[in-house]
Amino acid sequence: MEGSSRDLVEKFVSKKLSQNEACRKFSNNPNPMPYLMEPSTSERPGEGATQGIVEEEVLQALLEATEEFELRYQRAFSDLTSQLHITQDTAQQSFQQVMGELFRDGTNWGRIVAFFSFGRALCVESANKEMTDLLPRIVQWMVNYLEHTLQPWMQENGGWEAFVGLYGKNAAAQSRESQERFGRLLTIVMLTGVFALVCYMRRR
């Protein structure tokens, strides 16, 4: 998955936004964010097909895990999207504050799922407010944070292959009966006047 973080984030956000009415209205294309879906230039000769299969497995596992996460904490996410008060000037600050709180005391796969869910929520809120020019910027913030902050931990803990092993093939849905498998608590707090998402996950 080296060099494919942007592809993964773009496809994840695009898939999520395709379910959102506010975003679909901006384009008749089934893909609501065609300007984000640029072909990757990171593939080595002969690796495209294999890498594509791996990326699809990661994307599917990530979609299932975030869907389960958002379903589990539906009320919290509803409150979050209605109270974020996102503007062109405050979006990046809100993103940075939430990330600082989310990973303040460490990283685990559950918090990485929460990271993607929050990025999606931020994109949906921006689309709802017709600030679609924010979408590629949010994607870039996610890519930067993923590559520069989260990847060292991920590489030390088995990489995306380990994530697929934990959350792939509908494992997230099967974990509904086990609180330890998908986390302990989602809380929402005020941070310097900005409504932020804080998720404390128990290590698997």
Swiss-Prot record:
GO terms for biological process: extrinsic apoptotic signaling pathway in absence of ligand; intrinsic apoptotic signaling pathway in response to DNA damage; positive regulation of apoptotic process; release of cytochrome c from mitochondria. It comes from the Eukaryota. It comes from Xenopus laevis (African clawed frog). InterPro entries: Apop_reg_BclX (IPR013279), Bcl-2-like_sf (IPR036834), Bcl-2_BH1-3 (IPR046371), Bcl-2_fam (IPR026298), Bcl2-like (IPR002475), Bcl2/BclX (IPR004725), Bcl2_BH1_motif_CS (IPR020717), Bcl2_BH2_motif_CS (IPR020726). CDD domains: Bcl-2_like. Disulfide bonds: none annotated. GO terms for cellular component: mitochondrial outer membrane. Keywords: Apoptosis, Membrane, Transmembrane, Transmembrane helix. This is Apoptosis regulator R11. Signal peptide: none annotated. Confers strong protection against cell death. Belongs to the Bcl-2 family. A motif (BH2) lies at residues 152-167. Pfam families: Bcl-2 (PF00452). One of its GO terms (molecular function) is channel activity. It is a single-pass membrane protein. A motif (BH1) lies at residues 101-120. The keyword Protease does not apply. The keyword Transmembrane helix applies.
